[in-house]
UniProtKB/Swiss-Prot annotation:
It comes from Picosynechococcus sp. (strain ATCC 27264 / PCC 7002 / PR-6) (Agmenellum quadruplicatum). GO terms for biological process: translation. This is Large ribosomal subunit protein bL9. Binds to the 23S rRNA. InterPro entries: Ribosomal_bL9 (IPR000244), Ribosomal_bL9/RNase_H1_N (IPR009027), Ribosomal_bL9_bac/chp (IPR020594), Ribosomal_bL9_C (IPR020069), Ribosomal_bL9_C_sf (IPR036791), Ribosomal_bL9_N (IPR020070), Ribosomal_bL9_N_sf (IPR036935). The keyword Cytoplasm does not apply. Gene3D superfamilies: Ribosomal protein L9, C-terminal domain, Ribosomal protein L9, N-terminal domain. NCBIfam families: L9. Keywords: Ribonucleoprotein, Ribosomal protein, RNA-binding, rRNA-binding. Disulfide bonds: none annotated. GO terms for cellular component: ribonucleoprotein complex; ribosome.
């Protein structure tokens, strides 16, 4: 079997790896394509240290995001019930619907936190009453927010 070269990718390469990955490739592929195009660099001890430092920074950033999301979850728990006002008709049927934007606005007003409306999951809401919404703050952190729908 022929000798393989270790290179560190400087950008994503389809079917080979992502930016910063250490991969083994055929010497001709590295010498004739990856290195001249600037797509990869030879894996020297200095470059390997740089790659490891980048990975550590990325890991620290992801950990900080997770801790921030956990703190926001605790803050949302302490807020209490949110209030959403809607126009109602007979038998407390609401006109229109309660949207995720309504819940996001209520969270912003009450807790002072910006929440992406696309991360909010609502139950079917047809009448006034108490409901719960799931708010996805991070891929690993979901908070539950209670709210009341009351007449305008």
């Amino acid at each position: 079997m022929s000798k393989r070269l270790q290179v560190v990718l400087n950008q994503d390469v389809r079917k080979l790896g992502n930016n910063g990955d250490l991969v083994e490739v055929a010497p001709g592929y590295a010498r004739n394509y990856l290195l001249p195009q600037g797509i990869a660099s030879l894996a020297t001890p200095g470059i390997l240290r740089q790659v490891e430092q980048r990975r550590e920074k990325e890991r620290q950033r992801l950990l900080a995001e997770l801790q921030d999301a956990e703190a926001r979850k605790v803050a949302l728990k302490t807020v209490g019930k949110l209030i959403i006002r809607k126009q109602v008709g007979e038998e407390n049927q609401i006109f229109g619907t309660v949207t995720t934007q309504d819940v996001a606005d209520a969270i912003k007003e009450r807790a002072g936190q910006d929440v992406d409306r696309r991360g909010i999951t609502l139950p079917e809401i047809g009448k006034t009453g108490s409901y719960e919404a799931q708010v996805k703050l991070h891929p690993e952190v979901t908070a539950t927010v209670q709210f009341d729908v009351i007449p305008l």
